[in-house]
Amino acid sequence: MVRKIGRRARESSPSSTSSTLPADFSHSEMHRHIATSLAALTSSGPLPGLVVFDLDYTLWPLWVDTHVDSPLRRRGSDINKVYDRNGQPLSFFPHVPAIMLWLKRSGIPIAAASRTSAPTVARQALNGLFLVDDAHLLTSATDDDSPEKPSPAQSQPKVVKAIDLFDYQEIYPGSKITHFRKLHADSGIPYEDMIFFDDEYRNAEVGSKLGVHFVEVGHQGTDLGLVEKAIREWRAKKAARAKAEL
């Protein structure tokens, strides 16, 4: 396997305006906080037609063609974790599961656009990463106006496979322009209604050439603050276009 030099291609990538969460937050508390914050965002304006993620250093903190060795497999009932053949673990960045589950619950299609030279390994990761969708239970448990408590069956958290959250996958070497032209052709969604999260600024060309709203991801990966900021910026662009058309 060819090894890349250094931790990532662009260490100077800026950090996001991340919403700071207490260090001692449990998984459930963090999930609830993110779900509540994003629910407020849902009710405050329009939402994008498609949210697209790069994979390496955007959803997880490594290069799958460099830092892990195939095959990647889940162990037992582990959540948000797979291991390579040497026992090296891979997980999503902390906020990513709750963000992706919110997108799915909100009816916003999700796509992957990655130029990795190891697409099979990337799909092994997405197939092996299982997530717990318990945000709706956490919300109802703290809702004093709720007329009734959930039944025992409803109280069981739902476990979902990460790959099943993606409506579209463009995972292969090449240009992100090629990826997005395919996403546009397959989905019928206008470029200007797409938001793209990626850690490499060179891929901002999808914005200048196609009109996609590009969001550069910093060293912390995709997180709540970055998503909130991205949607607000996308809304501002949308409003400006509408005003210009009057």
Regions found by a protein language model. Give the residues of each.
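Non-catalytic pre-domain segments flanking phosphatase-related domains
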Residues: 1-55, 66-71, 240-246
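Asp-based, Mg2+/Mn2+-dependent phosphohydrolase catalytic module
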Residues: 2-11, 38, 177-195, 200-246
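Hydrophobic "anchor" residues
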Residues: 58-59
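Short coil/turn segments at secondary-structure boundaries
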Residues: 63-66, 115, 208-209
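Conserved phosphoryl-transfer catalytic core
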Residues: 67-93, 104
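Catalytic phosphate/metal-binding cores of nucleic-acid and nucleotide-processing enzymes, i.e., regions
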Residues: 70-75, 89-90, 128-129, 202-205, ...
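Substrate-recognition element of Asp-dependent hydrolases with the DxDx(T/V) motif
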Residues: 87, 91, 96-129, 169-171
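Substrate-recognition "cap/lid" segment bordering the active-site pocket of phosphatases
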Residues: 118-192
